[in-house]
Design a protein with these regions (language model features):
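Conserved N-terminal phosphate-binding loop of PLP-dependent enzymes in the Aspartate aminotransferase
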Residues: 1-250
Length: 250
């Protein structure tokens, strides 16, 4: 293993060098079934020939331009995502953590537009939203937060799948402006809420003029049988964050 990599993870003593579909091969030639889909990233498998071809063609044409200019493929993808999600606008960034960071910034902007100087976002126990400072604070796991204090202010934490706890916040907080929640918790243990949970959150957000922001980084792009997990609840959120399978590792 590379001696100059920072020890940010407890890496297993395996190095993969190639993949095909659901299979991976390590540097010793051993074959593995990737039952995790590259931690929910490789929704189309490894080394899909159509994806490899598209990457090669684009690399031969143009790799990067500034977003000061129009980017045709970006516009087409935004149109497609909005069509699938019934949403109106897309903001592209580099990772799931950045997507959730952007959602947090949107909520704060929304709060300030309502003359709330210190807007709060309701977040959940056992959640995971990323490792930037704001998303780390939103994450409901003290283990991953330890050592990075002081954390960012502006979050109110409640138990997952507990509408009464959110109602209590609504009854007692004049600064709350949004709810950030995973439709199904991933890192927290694959916790599936009650069937009426997301619909209940949507109703509470409507009643109090809050934003409902769904972290679909693990559940989005077809992983639950619908393009987005919120489709099962028959609701429409205000903000959706995507990553992982959206890029298939690219």
């Amino acid at each position: 293993m590379a001696e100059h990599l920072m020890s940010t993870y407890a890496r297993l003593p395996v190095e993969f060098e190639r993949g095909e579909g659901i299979w991976l091969w390590d540097t010793e030639g051993r074959q593995y079934l990737d039952a995790l889909s590259g931690i929910a990233v490789c929704g189309l498998g490894h080394a899909h020939p159509d994806i490899a071809s598209a990457i090669a063609v684009q690399a031969g044409q143009l790799v990067h331009t500034s977003n000061l200019y129009g980017i045709p493929h970006q516009s087409r993808l935004a149109d497609r995502l909005c069509s699938l999600a019934d949403m109106e606008r897309v903001f592209f960034c580099n990772s799931g953590a950045e997507a959730n960071e952007a959602a947090i910034k949107i909520a704060r902007l929304y709060g300030h537009s309502r003359d709330i100087d210190s807007p709060d976002i309701v977040v959940m126990d056992n959640s995971f939203h990323g490792r930037t400072m704001a998303t780390l604070t939103a994450t409901g796991n003290r283990k991953v937060q330890a050592g990075f204090e002081p954390l960012v202010q502006g979050f109110i934490r409640v138990p997952y799948d507990d509408l009464d706890a959110v109602r209590k916040v609504a009854d007692n907080s004049s600064n709350a402006v949004a709810v950030l929640v995973e439709p199904i918790q991933g890192e927290g243990g694959i916790n599936v809420p009650a069937d009426d949970y997301l619909a209940g959150l949507r109703q509470l957000c409507d009643e109090h003029d809050w934003l409902l922001m769904l972290d679909e980084i693990q559940t989005g792009m077809g992983r639950t049988g619908e393009w987005f997990a919120y489709r099962h609840a028959g609701i429409l959120p205000d903000v959706v964050s995507l990553a992982k399978a959206l890029g298939n590792g690219v």
